[in-house]
Amino acid sequence: MKNNEIDTIAAISTPIGRGGIGIIRVSGKLVPEVAMKLFNKIPKPRTAEYLTCIDHNGSIMEKVITLFFPEPHSFTGENILEIHGHGGQMILDLLLDRILNISSRIRLANPGEFTERAFLNEKIDLIQAESIADIINATSYQAAKSACNSLQGHFSNQIRIILNKITNFRTYIESTLDFSDQEISDISYQHIYNTLQNIIDNTNQICKLTHSGVLLRDGIKVVIAGKPNAGKSSLFNSLINKDRAIISNISGTTRDILHEYIQLNGIAFHIIDTAGFKKNSTNEIELIGMQKSKYELSKADHILWVIDSTDYSHNNSYNNIINSLKKELSSNNIEAVFITIIRNKSDLSFEHNGIDTTNKYACITLSALLNHGIDLLKKHLYDSAMLQIHKNSNFSSVEENQGNFIARKRHLKILQKVFQYLLSAKTQLQYNMTVNDCFAEDLKKAHEELAQIFGKLTPDDLLEEIFRAFCIGK
């Protein structure tokens, strides 16, 4: 640990403001001294005690409940004292100030420093540390549940299995390289190939599960797009159930990107309203808006392509609609995301609201202005999200998910790199029909890359970025 981290740290762990209970947390070597100064005794370990807290003159400050966890059997691996008092901000500030003035070696904790100490003292790994923040910041029931699974080690255990396999495999390969002047036998070659293929298959599967974990954490990104005045903003307002976007008959009202989160049956959805795609526009602001819209489309998990149903006949418009959409999307992206065509303004075209799934892309007829067909669209969004998550995991509903974990884009990028290094090693093996230094180097890179998920070999600036994203007191 760093020199400044040998200090004893203290912070208010509950949110700022008034509440029924306020909690102060203290961690470090000087916790027993703090307890003696505040209570004239050291509380019983792992036992809730109702004690009187006194100031430096011996006057009563507060009646509190204390919890004392001696090192190393605590969250941080250090002595920890939790003080549970009344939730008024003034009394909490006074108690914290009293603690900080006991010794010059007691200071206010940095954001996330309690969790950082738990990581540095090997009480948790980096995945579990990140999952604590994900529990706090969860935007849906499913995200919170999956983050709890990650905290329990579900994700870490699966990564550790692959890491151990690579470690053992590297040990075997290094011993083989010691006899590099001899060709390996057919039996040895097949063993090496099968072992590598098994690791590749395991890594590929965990990549898929991790992608599902990223979707659960960040929410399904739903981008509403289309031509100006098709009713995109009306649809946006209907989905989020509030008047967030300006609605007008004037074409091109939306110039910037609007973001909102909603939750459908425990799954978070990131709903995005975009500027319309106007043909042959020379307006600089409109062009900037359309460029932003294209960027959001390139990052979408699900695209709602909105059309004015009065501009397209129901029977002959499908191919024209898809062609107009393809103009705004890269050829790669259009096959990688869910796309739903929204035939809006059914109140003006006098069409029946409903969903048509006979073509490649589902088509939903609705009236965003009158809120007709919105429930059908929400069900479609949820069903599509479950398909996206289900194709990478082993559950088909929120209730069935008992072992899925939450993940971050950082984890997915690392695993994708590991997968590529392993594929490179396989190519080397197939081409040379033996192991060599290049093969061993690919395995080494895969090993080192995967270790970064746990925080091993992870740059200090990345660790600092991860822990400083926590609130103070966590």
UniProtKB/Swiss-Prot annotation:
K(+) binds at N229, S248, I250, T253. InterPro entries: G_TrmE, GTP-bd, GTP-bd_TrmE_N, GTPase_MnmE, MnmE_dom2, MnmE_helical, P-loop_NTPase, Small_GTP-bd. Its EC number is 3.6.-.-. Binds 1 potassium ion per subunit. It is found in: Cytoplasm. SUPFAM superfamilies: P-loop containing nucleoside triphosphate hydrolases. Gene3D superfamilies: P-loop containing nucleotide triphosphate hydrolases, Probable tRNA modification gtpase trme, domain 1, tRNA modification GTPase MnmE domain 2. It holds the Pfam family TrmE_N. It comes from the Bacteria. Mg(2+) binds at S233, T254. Residues 219-386 form the TrmE-type G domain. Keywords: Cytoplasm, GTP-binding, Hydrolase, Magnesium, Metal-binding, Nucleotide-binding, Potassium, tRNA processing. GTP binds at residues 229-234, 248-254, 273-276. One of its GO terms (molecular function) is metal ion binding. (6S)-5-formyl-5,6,7,8-tetrahydrofolate binds at R25, E82, K123, K474. GO terms for cellular component: cytosol. Exhibits a very high intrinsic GTPase hydrolysis rate. Involved in the addition of a carboxymethylaminomethyl (cmnm) group at the wobble position (U34) of certain tRNAs, forming tRNA-cmnm(5)s(2)U34. Homodimer. Heterotetramer of two MnmE and two MnmG subunits. PANTHER family: TRNA MODIFICATION GTPASE GTPBP3 (PTHR42714), TRNA MODIFICATION GTPASE GTPBP3, MITOCHONDRIAL (PTHR42714:SF2). This is tRNA modification GTPase MnmE. It comes from Blochmanniella floridana. The gene is mnmE.
